[in-house]
Amino acid sequence: MKLIDTTIAVDHLRGEPAAAVLLAELINNGEEIAASELVRFELLAGVRESELAALEAFFSAVVWTLVTEDIARIGGRLARRYRSSHRGIDDVDYLIAATAIVVDADLLTTNVRHFPMFPDLQPPY
């Protein structure tokens, strides 16, 4: 399973060719594409009215994960561990990282500096 963060979703929705290729390859390879409900929140918070239909179509293609107690607890631990040394990481990113850990998914993001808890993380494009 691949867990996408908001950067991948935004790139895809904005027509970034590399994001479209990445998601198409994952689908063609039978890979499950998941995202945290927090990604849905961030996308809905920033969408223009003219983009709502495309956003809803995107939503239907993704498996959505809820924020569970385990995710909240692990996210809290990650925030305590990294907040003082990695300023600028918001709480949503800690919870997305915790989601990847709990559901045992590979995190896909272009914003690797917000995920120091995954030292080998590289942007997918």
UniProtKB/Swiss-Prot annotation:
Induction record: Up-regulated 2.3-fold 7 days after infection of human macrophages.
Entry's Gene Ontology molecular function annotations: magnesium ion binding; RNA endonuclease activity
Chain sites annotated for binding Mg(2+): 5, 93
Needed co-factor(s): Mg(2+)
Assigned EC number: 3.1.-.-
Keywords tagged on the record: Hydrolase, Magnesium, Metal-binding, Nuclease, Secreted, Toxin-antitoxin system
A biological process term (GO) from this entry: negative regulation of growth
SUPFAM superfamilies, alphabetized: PIN domain-like
Biological function: Toxic component of a type II toxin-antitoxin (TA) system. An RNase. Upon expression in M.smegmatis inhibits colony formation. Its toxic effect is neutralized by coexpression with cognate antitoxin VapB19.
HAMAP family, A to Z: VapC_Nob1
Full protein name: Ribonuclease VapC19
Organism: Mycobacterium tuberculosis (strain ATCC 25618 / H37Rv)
Lineage: Bacteria, Bacillati, Actinomycetota, Actinomycetes, Mycobacteriales
